């Protein structure tokens, strides 16, 4: 036997030993606190106006510097992020499954005040939001006993009840930062008006358990606060201060309520979250950490809104040991061991708007999720935009003669991924 042969044989044995000793499955996973999104590089291009972030309980327009930053962010948008966040959302696009079999639910974001055409503004997107069940965030009271309003700093809203007449939805989320704009009587009256029109509600005193095609789905909704109101509502609005960056946010009540919803028979858990810093293209890693904790507590779908701009989407693998967590992969291990996937839409953007520009503010998405066999089987998205005189929500594809909307449509293709876009 030659020396070369001996060396080759030894090398093969060493490599075989190394492969045999390499960690596999969960043994290959890094410690959670030592990997993305807990570990990341700060945005090197972070503009100063990001210091104009507001948390809902501390609006203070007497602070001139902070107010100036806030207005600058409104005009320019925070478009960059951590390098790892950007890379992550680019890489996850290829792992998002297209809409599949099972129960299909559609979601839209913030239904904000409009100036006219209240009863018919949504006629053009009835087919776009079509699904087995349709959900929206009603970000304004509709109390007939209070004046119509949309002013102040921060603004207080109240819309005509006719706004509810033409809504193509089955469930409205009522808890967000504008829930208390006309007080307890106003939010209670809003709920009555919604129910009177045959829609269901969630987020005011109770969460919703609904049956869709013989499948029980729990819709639990939470808001990160009210707009700096000193009064305390007598209603339960399910407030969780999601925006306290750097703090260990207490999600124990949410976990208890998820468990209780499952005890009631929910086969899927959908969380509707009014959260996130306004006018920012990407979620802060803080919110990505929270979302992973919620998925670990049992969430199958997380639907976010509040930033008034569309943010990226990801699918999380639950109890898939071959899916190692990190940049480009959301993966979670839970004690029940049941393999599944969960969907996270960080922000759907606006559904309606009365601010005529920029295109990011006037454009949101209809998000869709398909559920079957205890799993998320697929996702889809369709962009929608607001037109004026009269106010009308239309498919963005019908607005492509407008260069701003055409540009925004292309940006969303890149931001979300075109492969799972729906017409």
Question: Which residue stretches match the model-derived regions?
Answer:
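Active-site environment of divalent metal-dependent phosphoester hydrolases
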Residues: 114-116, 142-145, 177-191, 203-204, ...
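Binuclear metal-dependent hydrolase catalytic cores centered on His/Asp/Glu-rich metal-binding motifs
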Residues: 119-122, 213-269, 399-402
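Short acidic, glycine-rich surface-loop motifs adjacent to enzyme active sites
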Residues: 133-144, 176, 257-282
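N-terminal catalytic scaffold of extracellular/periplasmic and nuclease hydrolases
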Residues: 26-175, 181-183, 190
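Conserved beta-sheet core of the metallophosphoesterase superfamily
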Residues: 169-171, 283-365
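Active-site-proximal segments of metal-dependent phosphoesterases and phosphodiesterases across multiple
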Residues: 145-166, 267-300
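Active-site neighborhood of phospho(di)ester-bond hydrolases with catalytic His/Asp-centered motifs
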Residues: 107-110, 133-139, 167-177, 200-205, ...
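A short C-terminal boundary segment appended to hydrolase-like catalytic domains
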Residues: 25-102, 261, 334-336, 356-423
């Amino acid at each position: 036997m030659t020396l070369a042969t001996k060396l080759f044989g030894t090398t093969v044995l060493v490599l075989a030993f190394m492969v045999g000793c390499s960690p596999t499955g969960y043994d290959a996973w890094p410690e959670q606190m030592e990997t993305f999104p807990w570990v990341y590089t700060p945005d090197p291009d972070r503009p100063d106006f990001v210091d104009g972030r507001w948390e809902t309980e501390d609006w203070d327009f007497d602070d001139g510097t902070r107010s100036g930053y806030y207005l600058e962010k409104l005009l320019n948008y925070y478009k960059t992020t951590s390098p790892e966040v950007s890379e992550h959302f680019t890489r996850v696009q290829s792992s998002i499954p297209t809409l599949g079999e099972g129960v299909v639910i559609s979601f839209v974001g913030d239904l904000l005040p409009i100036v006219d055409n209240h009863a018919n503004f949504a006629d053009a997107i009835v087919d776009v939001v079509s699904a087995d069940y349709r959900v929206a965030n009603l970000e304004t009271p509709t109390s007939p006993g209070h004046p119509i309003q949309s002013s102040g700093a921060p603004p207080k809203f109240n819309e005509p009840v006719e706004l509810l007449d033409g809504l193509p939805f089955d469930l409205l989320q009522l808890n967000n930062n504008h829930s208390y704009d006309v007080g307890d009587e106003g939010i209670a009256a809003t709920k009555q008006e919604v129910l009177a029109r045959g829609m269901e509600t969630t987020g005011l005193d109770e969460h919703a358990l609904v049956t869709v095609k013989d499948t029980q789905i729990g819709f639990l909704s939470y808001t990160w606060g009210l707009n700096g109101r000193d009064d305390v509502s007598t209603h339960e609005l399910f407030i969780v201060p999601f925006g306290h960056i750097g703090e260990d946010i207490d999600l124990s009540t949410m976990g208890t309520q998820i468990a209780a919803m499952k005890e009631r028979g929910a086969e899927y858990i959908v969380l509707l979250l009014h959260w996130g810093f306004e006018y920012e293209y990407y979620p802060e890693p803080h919110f990505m950490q929270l979302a992973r904790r919620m998925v670990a507590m049992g969430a199958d779908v997380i639907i976010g809104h509040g930033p008034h701009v569309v943010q990226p989407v990801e699918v999380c693998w639950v109890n898939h040991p071959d899916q190692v967590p990190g940049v480009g992969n959301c993966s979670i291990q839970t004690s029940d061991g049941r393999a599944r996937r969960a969907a996270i839409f960080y922000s759907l953007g606006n559904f309606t708007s009365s601010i005529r520009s920029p295109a990011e503010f006037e454009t949101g998405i209809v998000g869709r999720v398909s559920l079957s066999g205890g799993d998320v089987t697929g996702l889809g998205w369709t962009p929608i935009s607001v037109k004026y005189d009269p106010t009308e929500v239309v498919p963005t594809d019908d607005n492509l003669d407008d260069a701003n909307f055409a540009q925004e449509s292309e940006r969303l293709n890149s931001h979300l991924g075109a492969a799972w876009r729906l017409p």
